Amino acid sequence: MAIDFKQDILAPVAQDFAAMDQFINEGISSKVALVMSVSKHVVEAGGKRMRPIMCLLAAYACGETNLKHAQKLAAIIEMLHTATLVHDDVVDESGLRRGRPTANATWNNQTAVLVGDFLIARAFDLLVDLDNMILLKDFSTGTCEIAEGEVLQLQAQHQPDTTEDIYLQIIHGKTSRLFELATEGAAILAGKPEYREPLRRFAGHFGNAFQIIDDILDYTSDADTLGKNIGDDLMEGKPTLPLIAAMQNTQGEQRDLIRRSIATGGTSQLEQVIAIVQNSGALDYCHKRATEETERALQALEILPESTYRQALVNLTRLALDRIQ
């Protein structure tokens, strides 16, 4: 039976989700009109808001009863996520995000960077309101690690010798770490330290699977579905897992073509590279790795007591994998 996002995932925290939106709207308020305009633009471009939903579900799965604290933490997660996307778009020179013009394309790089900084600062301002030093320390360290992941990705650009281990380090920092903050933070907030590690492992494996799936879709989907241009990763010279696996499975001219494409970037040979990726067994390997990460995520969840909220986290995990079924 197909999983319905609204009914099987969002419904248990729908009221809290609406309250979280209010915290976000308050969080992006500013005396500077341009800051508010840009913040509103990027926040409204949000997708399904999986990270704050995961945060709310994890909080309730841990037995959290303080609704306002959980709602505020979810808003903090979404503001941090939005800030990283704004900065990503500047670094990647992206003009499109989820089918909408990016902040840097609509205004300019300088404005986008500064508003991203504002969103991070405001998120920590809200975090201080929660009055929990363990939570504050976790988020401070985690935010540094997210930035380090982005720098690692920058270092790996145009480097065809990037290994799968390095790729996993990159995606842990740039993607999985914020998922970990969302769920581990919920356990801290709920005063349930025994659930910190299981929820961190769940979110880490979920984030890995989620990013691998995203990287698969860059070679199998279309611009309308992705909300960005097909082949963006290749154009930017990013050695993602489909390319790394394709190089492992090929030799001679095919392997050399992928290496050159990573080294130079651009999309002049995109069709040939897509064909090699699709015919080399690389996508099968990526699918296998995404499935393994998903299974590990689900195993970690088993430590939590049974509840509607835990089941919704299971549903979310399975739905993420369904994107490539």
UniProtKB/Swiss-Prot annotation:
Assembly notes: Homodimer.
Gene Ontology biological process terms in this record: isoprenoid biosynthetic process; ubiquinone biosynthetic process
Uppermost EC category: transferase
Record: residues binding Mg(2+) 2: D88, D92
Name assigned to this protein: All-trans-nonaprenyl-diphosphate synthase (geranyl-diphosphate specific)
Record key words, sorted: Magnesium, Metal-binding, Transferase, Ubiquinone biosynthesis
Keyword Mitochondrion set for record: no
The EC number(s) this enzyme carries: 2.5.1.84
